[in-house]
Amino acid sequence: MGAVLGVFSLASWVPCLCSGASCLLCSCCPISKNSTVTRLIYAFILFLGTIVSCIMMTEGIQTQLKKIPGFCEGGFQIKMVDTKAEKDCDVLVGFKAVYRINFAVAIFFFAFFLLMLKVKTSKDPRAAVHNGFWFFKIAAIIGIMIGSFYIPGGSFTEVWFVAGMLGASFFIIIQLVLLVDMAHSWNELWVNRMEEGNPRLWYAALLSFTSLFYILSIVFAALLYVFYTKPDDCTENKVFISLNLIFCVAVSIVSILPKVQEHQPRSGLLQSSIITLYTLYLTWSAMTNEPERSCNPSLMSIITHLTSPTVSPANSTTLAPAYAPPSQSGHFMNLDDIWGLIIFVFCLIYSSFRTSSNSQVNKLTLSGSDSVILGDTTNGANDEEDGQPRRAVDNEKEGVQYSYSFFHLMLCCASLYIMMTITSWYSPDAKFQKVSSKWLAVWFKMGSSWLCLLLYLWTLVAPLVLTGRDFS
């Protein structure tokens, strides 16, 4: 009897698979809005794609993929550096799988980007497709994934690698904008609370976190100088670290200039400290992609040097061993790639909960003027009977709270960023005989760090330059 009731209880949720997003989650968070829950579900779909991509790099999955006719032989035949020929297929099956998984996810979100252009309110019939029909969407993604494994190699992987570089570059720009927006919003929130009451507490909190981020930045920069430079070598690394340190000091000074404070009172050192730390991360990430291993020590050698008291500074040249061949299970992510995914997940969650009222960077992903927060009071959220799937309030009848099309474009580019991150930005050579790090990835990431600083600097000086525009 209990099993029968369980089946009927499960069946009551089936309509949710073909209806709105809020129906799927609102039993655990009844006071929510449709715009927020929909973004969370799309973000969760992308997160699942990321997990599947990571799983595809494991040995067991690769063994099964090798059984697919033509997947390992023919097409994109390349060899990993310092890897024996009999292990080539084990490594590249994982790389091919990551390309195809994220191809399916990117195509799915790009199709929705085109479909959702010019959607203004939830009354648009296309809004129902955006906010519902989850069974068919998931089935479509799975179908595209399965079909992508039968796409011939060769030119497909070559073209998709270029597409991945372009898409990942655009997502890094979006990620940088979200980071700047988060820093501004955090500072504004705490400054407001400091003005409302108990100023000493919030001032101490602001000072503590600002000091912490700057201390971490100083330690980070010192470690980069110690392990990624040499007295008579690694000139590029010295220039990269020094330039970005100078730029970070410059934007920190600009953020507290009287003129900037006059036009933008909420600007301060908290934002600058976050941007400084992130810029140094991008600098480190760029240097880990350098093909010259003498200036790019492995993580294990650095840890050994830090933990072993027997290693002297005179032996610091041992920190740059030859490139370690990947295991039989294939190449997996480096530490900087893992940190890149962590930052990606954070930005993805932030973009899902992000409110339009606290956006400081031109409301990049939002178009409405109302706040989209889970804690808002809603009417009719509990109208459903107990035990039935609760539905969230449709807060977009008068206007969408974010750009549907841009949100899908962001997720499309995010899937390409995941693809490049998991494969460590490896680039095939002209004859497709090996795959290795390239200076292109180094300059790409360094350019991203400079773009981050430029974006933040623009948010500081924009009110001074565009005096006729309201930045409040």
From Swiss-Prot:
UniProt topological domain (Extracellular) ranges: 1-96, 154-158, 228-238, 351-405, 467-472
Predominant place of localization: membrane
Membrane topology of the entry: Multi-pass membrane protein
Sites bearing Phosphoserine, chain numbering: 371
Assigned keywords, A-Z: Antiviral defense, Cell membrane, Glycoprotein, Golgi apparatus, Immunity, Innate immunity, Membrane, Phosphoprotein, Transmembrane, Transmembrane helix
Cytoplasmic topological domain: 118-132, 180-206, 260-329, 427-445
The protein's name: Serine incorporator 3
UniProt tissue specificity: Highly expressed in the neuronal populations such as Purkinje cells in the cerebellum, brainstem and spinal motor neurons, locus coeruleus and raphe nuclei. Highly expressed also in thymus, kidney liver and testis.
PTM description: N-glycosylated.
Any one GO molecular function term: phospholipid scramblase activity
Subcellular location: Cell membrane; Golgi apparatus membrane
GO biological process: antiviral innate immune response; plasma membrane phospholipid scrambling; positive regulation of endoplasmic reticulum stress-induced intrinsic apoptotic signaling pathway
Glycosylation sites: 34
Catalytically driven reaction(s): a 1,2-diacyl-sn-glycero-3-phospho-L-serine(in) = a 1,2-diacyl-sn-glycero-3-phospho-L-serine(out); a 1,2-diacyl-sn-glycero-3-phosphocholine(in) = a 1,2-diacyl-sn-glycero-3-phosphocholine(out); a 1,2-diacyl-sn-glycero-3-phosphoethanolamine(in) = a 1,2-diacyl-sn-glycero-3-phosphoethanolamine(out)
Matches recorded under Pfam families: Serinc (PF03348)
Functional description taken from the UniProt entry: Restriction factor required to restrict infectivity of gammaretroviruses: acts by inhibiting an early step of viral infection. Impairs the penetration of the viral particle into the cytoplasm. Non-ATP-dependent, non-specific lipid transporter for phosphatidylserine, phosphatidylcholine, and phosphatidylethanolamine. Functions as a scramblase that flips lipids in both directions across the membrane. Phospholipid scrambling results in gammaretroviral surface exposure of phosphatidylserine and loss of membrane asymmetry, which leads to loss of infectivity.
Signal sequence interval, chain numbering: none
TM spans (from-to): 97-117, 133-153, 159-179, 207-227, 239-259, 330-350, 406-426, 446-466
Family as reported in the entry's similarity comment: Belongs to the TDE1 family.
Coiled-coil portions: none
Keyword GTP-binding found: no
GO cellular component, as recorded: Golgi apparatus; Golgi membrane; plasma membrane
